[in-house]
Amino acid sequence: MAANSSFFLADNCAPHNQSFIQFCIHAASKKKGRIALMCLANLFLLFSFHLLYARFCSGFPYVVPSTARSTNQIFHTNLEQLVNSPENKQIFSQLKFSDQAFYDPHDNVVGTTEFPVFNQYQRQPYVANGYIGSRIPNLGQGFTYDQLTNSSTANDDDLLNGWPLFNKRYSGAFVAGFYDLQKNTTGTNFAELLENGYESVIAAVPQWTALSLSVEILGKKYTLDPSLEHEAIGDITNYVQNMSLSDGIVTTQFTWLNTFDVKYEILAHRENINLGLVNMQVYNPGNESVQVIVSDVLDFNSSQRCQLNQISHDKNGIYVTFHPQGLSYIDGAIYSTLSANGQITREQTNETVFQNVELTIEPHSCVQVAKYVGIATTDLDPDSFKTADDVLKFARKVSQNKKHGDATQLVNSHRSAWSKIIQDAPLVTFPSDSLLNLGARASIFHLLANTRPNAEGVTGALGVSGLSSDSYGGMVFWDTDLWMLNGILPFAPDHIKSFINYRVHLHQQAIDNVPRGYQGAVYPWTSGRFGNCTGTGPCLDYEYHINMAVAMASWQLYISGAADDTFLESVAYPIINDAASFLAEYVVHYNDTLGKYTTKNLTDPDEFANHVDNGAYTNTGIVLVMRWAQIAGSILGKQVPKIYHDIETAMFLPTAENTQNITLEYSGMNSSVGIKQADVIMMTYPLENELIDQDQAYINMEFYSMKQVGYGPAMTFPIFSIVASNLAFTGCASQSYLHKAIQPFLRGPFAQFAEQNNDDYLTNGGTHPAFPFLTAHGGFLQAILQGLTGMRFDYTFENNKLQRLLKLDPIALPCLGEGVRFDSIKYDNHTLSMAINETHFTIKNKGKTTPNARNYVTILLAERNAMHGKYTINDEDEQSFPLFETSESFPDSISECNKAGFFNITEGAYGDVSISINDGDNTTSWQAKYNDTTGKVLVDLKSFRNISSGTFIWGDKPPKRVKVSKYSGSSFTAVTDFFAQVDFGNELFNEYKYANPEGKLHNQSDVFEEVYSGDVKISAPFDPEEYFQVWVPTRHNITEVAVNLQTRFLLIEVDEIHNTEAIDGDYGGAKLAEVVFY
């Protein structure tokens, strides 16, 4: 059965098998002989079908109402088993908002059985198809603002979105490119620029998913409206809400008022991008008929930054037309058609229009109501949609089009369209790491759901949070051109063409943005409808690297083979050349003293350092833009200015004046910096070590790893993982960074990245996190593909000819067991599959995607690979190659990397992951969150081992005391046994109650035997001279422990710290940089 299959039979809304029995008896009692006979004759077949169907989470399993639960618990039991299965808990015990979350990897469905009484953005799924999108609240439909929880730590700041709007979060509906025009925003970068041009942020359209259900019981009315207080909604039990990562359908099901079983199914159609469906089914398991009212509502008050044009109804449905704020010449329309077996009445107020149907639900029967919604805007086809009537006419046509069939047929066509994109096999699989497996599949889904192939004009725009949120005003940053694009390009190149089309659409404005007297084009930091320079989106004296990202996007598409020389001439070259021209004339200046080209008054990606000179990432990116312009010009036979070559070969790069030669983020940077996000590290990826060599790149990685602040955004550590994959020759930091990139940032239950590792504005550095943070989904995909396989779209260029190469540098993955598999990678008009297992890398050419493609692809294995060189892989051929294997950082260790698992029992500092303790890299660490409590870590050596000694490398915050204990028993054989059955002095056992059905707890002292305890001496005292250098420490505080014992499990405990004053604002506990046992 396909994911999200209904427990109702699709054609006649028949109930599930348990109530089916009751229905047969009820029919027989009324002498409905033929019906009863048919029911009984098919009972055995139906029951057998459901046994087969009962694979947990095959779509949306039916949950038997608690007040009338049969002894046959097939569906309920299996879902409960899934939620509490070790495989499922292994994922969600690591993620926030995930107490009752589940993931069914077979059907690729995520969901939760926990009813969120309070609507919170982290707990909400959404639907989207690249043109329309909507966030879905707890009841499965409708509009609500976020609601403050009853937690003692809840505060009003929890309800707010971030810069630049700082508005209250809500379950909004959005249309691609539907940007407004407004004088200003609450937050800006350069407020003085507001005088030069208005802002343009995304407008939320009226919420189209609202389909409420009302009933009166004992004189009190209850309504399924998520904006109401819980008392007005009524009791919700047996709750399940899920989202398919294969087709994007969101399904919500529950028992309401202990009386009805209600199911909502919502989709944004993948193929018919203007069409949304809300399908509701209500089942009455009782013995009396019940009257209910279904209301289809379009409420203009659920919109944001829109102006109402008309709200009304006709004989077939209801509709609303509107403009984005400040733009009367741009129109939007929503038309809703209700399909129900009853008399529909319609009414309206000044800002709301309803269509209602009163239905009688007979005992043991169900009713089905479907809402077909057409949504359109002028931007989709400006040449055809010239008036509001044109847009409304089209929306009405979409809503009432009989060709799409009934709800079941619409669901089927939607799934069919999705299957053409993702095909049958999962695009990424981590067989041995369920969290990475979910993160990869979710990231592909979220980026595909929020994009569509070849979108034109402003509808190709993709904001930081896609089509379900107005985080960052829905505006377009470099996040789209660099982070999202490089993440999804290898899987769906047609989708990323939309990003480039959007930049082409605004290219003339970018030309107009250039100051008088200069040439080229300059894009603003933020873009909406117009692409002009604004208070949020300055063009000058700020993040010039946005222009490199825009240029790089078109260049990457070209060298990937997804675009040809026609694209190069008409699209890529104008963008690249105009960027080069502007940068060469306006941004770059020749410094006679240095004999180099320099830059001034800019901001690199690290936005903690504004108005600096010679940003390392920016200067390096400028070099590449100059090179691309020259190569593209040569291919096309165009003359390019000599200055491009001069800048390419003589760009200044600031470096530290010592033997380590660390690249400075900007001229004059000192050692006290706290870096917001990946910056210099990005010189290695995606800028491929331009201006630096491998040694300098490696020392950069080590230095800047220690300088990242603990509250930076989620795109930082995917880059560190990629760079460690590329550079590290010992240890397994590539894999520890990979977990650091996902575990603190991914939110359950619907596997969406948050911008921050801590969502609390009061404690995370003052950020209201963007959500969902598609930037991180794109970054994570790059970490697993471009990182672990080393895949790069590369080329050679000789005699004005560009030869495409797929560069590969696959590495061994000791911490990831069976490795990783990739299917349906698109390169040079071919489909490839790639896999890393324990010993080899395998690549298969699965054939052409276009008839005119060559019969082969050319790959280049990196120099460090034992089989370095070029290889031709013909269509349908497969080849295997060795992996690059790092050596051990600590020879003879029994605990480094995959030899042991380190698991924190007490909380770590925000963003830290315990795998950093044994990854063989002293510049990564795990820090105890608090200094006034004991930090505890459990070590699993994976088998019974003889241990003679241990080494603790503390980093810059050694504890005052350390204690090591061993487990000598035999009843506990897994980490979860300890977590579930041992009282470590915190509430950890409550999170693992599923693994302790008897509820018996053991005291820590009864389980572990102390084998070492001692004070930690300072072996590397603080050296002010060293501290004030831009320098990776070569001295470490180390504690050596001599023991003689045998065990599999160890407990490490650390107390307090030596520092009496905080270093760099860090008030946490002890840091464990590396722990090694021999």
From Swiss-Prot:
Pfam families (alphabetical): Glyco_hydro_65m, Glyco_hydro_65N
Residues annotated to bind substrate: W478, D479, K676, Q677
The EC number(s) this enzyme carries: 3.2.1.28
SUPFAM superfamilies given in the database record: Galactose mutarotase-like (SSF74650), Six-hairpin glycosidases (SSF48208)
Enzyme active site: E607
Molecular function GO terms recorded: alpha,alpha-trehalase activity; carbohydrate binding
Sites where a glycan is attached: 4, 17, 150, 184, 242, 287, 301, 350, 532, 591, 601, 661, 670, 829, 837, 904, 922, 931, 946, 1003, 1037
Keywords annotated in UniProt: Cell wall, Glycoprotein, Glycosidase, Hydrolase, Secreted, Signal, Virulence
GO CC terms of this entry: cell wall-bounded periplasmic space; extracellular vesicle; fungal-type cell wall; fungal-type vacuole lumen; membrane
Described purpose of this protein according to its UniProt entry: Cell wall acid trehalase that catalyzes hydrolysis of the disaccharide trehalose and required for growth on trehalose as carbon source. Plays a role in dimorphic conversion and virulence.
Record's protein name: Cell wall acid trehalase ATC1
Organism listed in the record: Candida albicans (strain SC5314 / ATCC MYA-2876) (Yeast)
Gene from which the chain derives: ATC1
